[in-house]
Amino acid sequence: MLYALGHPASFGVLLVSFVVGIVLHGWVQGLAAVAMGDSVARLEKRNKPEPRVHIDPFGAVGALIGGLGWAHPIELPGRRDRRRAVVVALVGPAVNVALGVGLLLLWRAALNGGLSAGEAAVWGHAGGAGTDLQHGFSFAGDALGFAVLLAGASQLYLGVLSLIPIPPLDGGRLLFALAPSTLGWQRARHHLIGQNIGLVVVLVMLVLPLGGRLLLLAVLDQVLAPLLRVLLGV
C-alpha cells in the first residue's frame, strides 16, 4: 500500500478499503461468536465495530508493504464445537468476498468506463489486480469508477487471502482448530502458532518478491483470474 503513495487517490481508497474490510471481517466474526455463546469474544468487545479491536499490527504491516493484510485473530473453540469454529472462521472472509463481488458487479453494471478493455483483460488474465493493490494507479477519467473497482478487488483479495490454511489466517486457524490431537499436529501447532512461524511465513510471502512479484499476490492473481473474468466481463 505504501508503494501507492505516488497515486494519492489509489492510496486513499486502498487505506479506507483495508480498514473497513478488516473491521467488518472481525466484527461479523465477533457477532457470530457471541451469538453462539462465546463469552470471551464479548469481553474482548469483538462484537463491536471498533478498529483498534480488529486491526492486527502484523496484518497492518502486511497491508502497508504488500497491499493485503488480515484481521486480529479470534479464538476458535476447536474440536469440542466444530460448528461454531467453522461458522466463526468463515463468516469474516465470506463478508469480504461478498462485498468485493458486489462492488465489482456494481462497477460493471453502472460505472464501467474507467478501465479500458486491455486493462480489464490484464486483471482477468494473469491477474494484474494484485500489482494494482500494491502500487495503485492513476485515477484518470472516471474517479468514482476507479475507486469502486479498486475497493472491490481489495475486498475480494482480502477475503480469499484469509482462507489460506496457514495461521494466523482464518483458514490456518480453522485447520488447527479442527485437527486431531495427534503428536504430529501438536508439534505443527506449537511451531506454526506457538512460535509464530506461521506468521513469519505469511509475512515473508506477502512482502518479499519472488521473480519480481510478491508470492502471495501472484498466487491470488492466478486463483482469482477466472472469477475476475466473469465479474468484469472480459
Can you say where each PLM-predicted feature lies in the sequence?
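Hydrophobic transmembrane alpha-helices and their immediate loop junctions
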Residues: M1-V234
